[in-house]
């Protein structure tokens, strides 16, 4: 009988030992996952969800809708953009907006703002007015990583953007990796501004952008600098605005701009 008790004890001891090892592995794995999740959430809190205070300028101004780098400043004539992706290849404005303008867009400007992965991803209203329309284009979410790498490498060399422009080149060598500008999914927000003109803000989705978050709706009255949305991981925001007497563009390609604060144009 004693022998049976000892054998039973040994058997249960083995079961307890194995069970303890399994539980230990599970607990350690859970701790490792938790620590990894903490690192991820800490990264997200410090790098992705930045929302700094901004000094909103007053007066007859159009401010940047996003933080980033000016990729291009294009003058639009007769509804045609002289070039965006391919040098010397013009495109109609509808190819970019993925919709027909609310009225014929004859003359105006297009300014493209590339947002850094590590920058502020809040988007802001560029000019006071009323939200006339919001259009979603459910195209592919194209990868912008190659474009961002080339932009960063160019910015690391002092004077390179200026030098490229002097030689008649695009400020950033992204021509062969910039198809996302016209093909990627996007949201176009149309603002009827205080001039009686239309301003089109186009938020372009990156491969890593799950959704373009929007906190306004059609018919909303909005003020310059108002936070109206968020783009995960950064991406690109382009702005189209019609010309008007006395309009003056205040930025150039290669400039760093801050959403709600940097003046793109005065009128």
Regions found by a protein language model. Give the residues of each.
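Contiguous, well-folded functional domains in the mature portion of proteins
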Residues: 1-267
């Amino acid at each position: 009988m004693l022998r049976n008790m000892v054998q039973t004890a040994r058997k249960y001891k083995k079961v307890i030992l194995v069970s303890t090892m399994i539980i230990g592995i599970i607990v350690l794995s859970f701790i490792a996952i938790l620590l990894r999740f903490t690192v991820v959430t800490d990264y997200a809190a410090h790098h992705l969800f930045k929302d700094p205070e901004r000094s909103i300028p007053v007066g007859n101004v159009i401010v940047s809708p996003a933080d980033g780098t000016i990729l291009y400043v294009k003058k639009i004539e007769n509804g045609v953009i002289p070039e965006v992706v391919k040098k010397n290849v013009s495109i109609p404005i509808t190819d970019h907006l993925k919709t027909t303008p609310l009225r014929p867009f004859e003359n105006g400007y297009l300014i493209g703002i590339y947002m850094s992965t590590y920058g502020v991803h809040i988007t802001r209203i560029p000019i006071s007015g009323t939200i006339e329309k919001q259009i979603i284009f459910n195209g592919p979410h194209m990868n912008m990583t190659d474009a961002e790498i080339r932009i960063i490498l160019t910015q690391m060399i002092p004077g390179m953007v200026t030098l490229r422009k002097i030689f008649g080149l695009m400020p950033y060598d992204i021509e062969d990796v910039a198809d996302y500008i016209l093909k990627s999914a996007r949201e176009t927000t149309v603002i009827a501004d205080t001039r009686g003109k239309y301003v089109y803000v186009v938020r372009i989705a990156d491969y890593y952008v799950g959704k373009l978050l929007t906190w306004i709706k059609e018919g909303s009255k909005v003020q310059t600098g108002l936070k109206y949305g968020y783009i995960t991981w950064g991406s690109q925001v382009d702005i189209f605005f019609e010309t008007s007497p006395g309009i003056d563009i205040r930025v150039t390609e290669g400039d760093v701009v801050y959403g709600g604060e940097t003046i793109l144009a005065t009128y």
